[in-house]
């Protein structure tokens, strides 16, 4: 089949890029002709804001200094990151020749199927306050099979009217899946639609498949603990990683990005492939990130996933609970012991979940 995929494939975010790659590779390895549909809404083009961390409470002079620091540091980092991600996309992706601007254009596209997801493609907080009709495949077509794979949204950011509107749109889908159990329950309370819960695409690929994509040579020669925070920089988490590194006679390497204040611990920007390398060769991983957790899991690395208790820990908690690894969840500030992990049980759980998720995907395309 010729398949178009609508996701946040151009987002300059390690998780977004690697999950897009994983879904692309899974479909392509199954013999399908696959490309990412180029859709470039303004709300995704430039996610970084120069003044987002500046504070005026310390006086106008301090505020101006902070703004200037953000302008120069964020701009430099954004340019470097854009280049890294552009190289990654050119190497691994196939993109549609044309840029699509509305659902009517999609209805005329020469695809046998269009898959929307993974990622929070149905989250109005991300899609400019509304359900984006592109990501909900809001068009009429008897020719194109509509499928969602691991699509997501936040219950906190969608009201009942909008949820009912979403249900109305996905009624025309051939197959629907979401990536969180809570979202399936949410839909079950609103409709009679058959909805399945599937793995995030990063977990569809095996350890050997991920390793085949990255260079064998390690980036960092010395022993290190990898720190990756995707929900803002928390000094307490940095301290947890630093203390753990001391126990392991290692240094801390921070791959969080966009954070010049702790640049001495690492780089401000890494490519998605570099990130894989950093995870695989780390003595341990300390992360506040679903994808940091997922990749540590699939690469079978010692790790700790730090919970911020901000209402956004659910995905990680559910994932690790399902894998029998809840012991790797730790609150902010708690001392981290040297991790000693046995992956034998988690490996079996992951294999079972992967088989079910691939079954959903391939059945939807057959």
Report residues per predicted region.
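Active-site anion-handling motifs in enzyme catalytic cores
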Residues: 1-366
């Amino acid at each position: 089949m010729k398949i178009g995929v609508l996701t946040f494939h151009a987002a300059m975010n390690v998780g977004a890029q690697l999950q897009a790659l994983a879904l692309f590779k899974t479909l392509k390895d199954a013999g399908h002709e696959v490309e990412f549909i180029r859709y470039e809404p303004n709300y995704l083009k430039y996610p970084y804001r120069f003044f987002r961390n500046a504070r005026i409470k310390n006086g106008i002079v301090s505020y101006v200094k902070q703004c200037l620091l953000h302008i120069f540091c964020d701009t430099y980092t954004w340019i470097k990151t854009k280049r890294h991600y552009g190289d990654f996309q050119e190497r691994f992706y196939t993109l549609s020749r044309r840029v699509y601007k509305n659902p009517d254009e999609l209805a005329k596209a020469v695809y046998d199927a269009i898959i929307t997801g993974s990622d929070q493609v149905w989250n109005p907080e991300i899609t400019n306050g509304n359900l984006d009709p592109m990501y909900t495949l809001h068009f009429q077509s008897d020719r194109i099979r509509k499928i969602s794979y691991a699509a997501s949204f936040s219950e906190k950011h969608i009201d009942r009217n909008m949820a009912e509107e979403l249900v109305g749109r996905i009624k025309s889908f051939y197959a629907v899946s979401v990536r969180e159990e809570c979202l399936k329950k949410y839909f079950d309370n609103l409709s009679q639609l058959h909805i399945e819960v599937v793995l995030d695409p990063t977990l569809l690929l095996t350890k050997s498949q991920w390793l085949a994509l990255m260079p064998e040579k390690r980036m960092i020669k010395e022993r290190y603990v990898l720190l990756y925070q995707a929900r803002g920089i928390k000094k307490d988490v940095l301290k947890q990683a630093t203390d753990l590194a001391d126990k392991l006679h290692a240094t801390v390497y921070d791959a969080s990005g966009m954070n010049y204040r702790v640049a001495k611990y690492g780089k401000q920007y890494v490519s998605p492939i570099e990130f894989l390398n950093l995870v695989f060769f780390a003595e341990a991983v300390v992360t506040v990130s679903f994808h940091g957790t997922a990749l540590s899991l699939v690469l079978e690395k010692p790790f700790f996933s730090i919970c911020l208790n901000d209402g956004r820990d659910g995905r990680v908690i559910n994932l690790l609970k399902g894998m029998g690894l809840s012991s790797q969840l730790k609150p902010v500030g708690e001392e981290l012991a040297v991790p000693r992990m046995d992956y034998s049980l988690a490996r079996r759980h992951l294999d079972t979940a992967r088989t079910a998720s691939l079954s959903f995907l391939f059945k939807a395309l057959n």
